[in-house]
């Protein structure tokens, strides 16, 4: 925005005010409507398909996604994270896991996944960049005191996002065990509403499907969501030499009303710093 933009806005505002005094205000254009069911069905030969009615979950997902994309101005930021140090630390921690007795015999007390460490890194980053740990409301900005990280979990017929509350205060082992428990109960649709409603941000990971990078839709009232791609060996240039490193691409979607581009970049840089120096997640 420059001086000319401000002057034009002032002039336009004055002209608009004068016009609205002279006549009725212009009506807001109607939102475009999707194709009707009849219009869609006419495109296909009768008998060439089966019409499966939507269940309540699919209807809710559709409504929430339309709401998110039509009311939230999405802004996207992407960068690569080297994860060799993270993978080494994960192996070291898993190898050191104490054994505990279970119904099926002895088993490790925890088994960390890369996604568990991503959840913790996102929580750490939000604590380092607290202005990005926010939610937009028309009356003001909600500044959250803790990082409640939602994690997208695919379930039969849809998607749900259980939330790791106060992930900034929890250890990696607690996050890991909590996520495993909620993921199992999510797939059997046994989560309590308070376990998937709310939250301050979310993580969506499609790396297990080999997806390199993608962008995710923000889940209101969140102002951010992190899309995580697959970790893979890639050539990198370090000190003028080509080397091979394990690299993971991440894309941060932000609600531009709450998190401007520079603030989102600061948050993503803090996430990258934590992922590439993972010992910081242990203190």
What name fits each language-model region?
Residues 5-283:
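C-terminal catalytic/motor cores of large multi-domain enzyme assemblies
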């Amino acid at each position: 925005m420059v001086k000319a933009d401000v002057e034009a806005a002032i002039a336009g505002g004055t002209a608009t005010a004068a016009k609205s005094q002279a006549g009725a205000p212009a009506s807001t254009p109607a939102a475009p409507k999707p194709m009707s069911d009849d219009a869609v069905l006419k495109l296909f030969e009768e008998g060439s398909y089966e019409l499966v009615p939507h269940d309540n979950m699919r209807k809710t997902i559709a409504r929430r996604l339309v709401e998110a994309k039509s009311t939230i101005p999405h802004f996207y930021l992407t960068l690569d994270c080297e994860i060799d140090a993270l993978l080494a630390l994960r192996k070291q921690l898993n190898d050191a896991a104490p054994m505990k007795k279970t119904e099926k015999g002895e088993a490790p007390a925890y088994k960390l996944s890369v996604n568990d460490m991503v959840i913790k890194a996102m929580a750490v980053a939000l604590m380092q960049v607290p202005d990005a740990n926010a939610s937009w409301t028309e009356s003001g900005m909600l500044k959250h005191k803790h990082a409640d990280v939602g994690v997208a979990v695919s379930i039969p017929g849809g998607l749900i996002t259980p939330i790791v509350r106060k992930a900034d205060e929890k250890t990696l082992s607690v996050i890991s065990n909590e996520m495993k428990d909620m993921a199992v109960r999510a797939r059997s649709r046994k989560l309590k509403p308070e376990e998937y409603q709310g939250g301050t941000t979310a993580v969506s990971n499609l790396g297990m499907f080999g997806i390199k990078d993608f962008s995710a839709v923000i889940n209101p009232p969140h102002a951010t969501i992190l899309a995580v791609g697959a970790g893979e060996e890639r050539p990198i240039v370090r000190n003028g030499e080509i080397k091979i490193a394990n690299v993971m691409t991440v894309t941060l979607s932000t609600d531009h009303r709450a998190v401007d581009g520079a603030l989102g970049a600061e948050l993503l840089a803090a996430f990258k710093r934590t992922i590439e120096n993972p010992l910081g997640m242990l203190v």
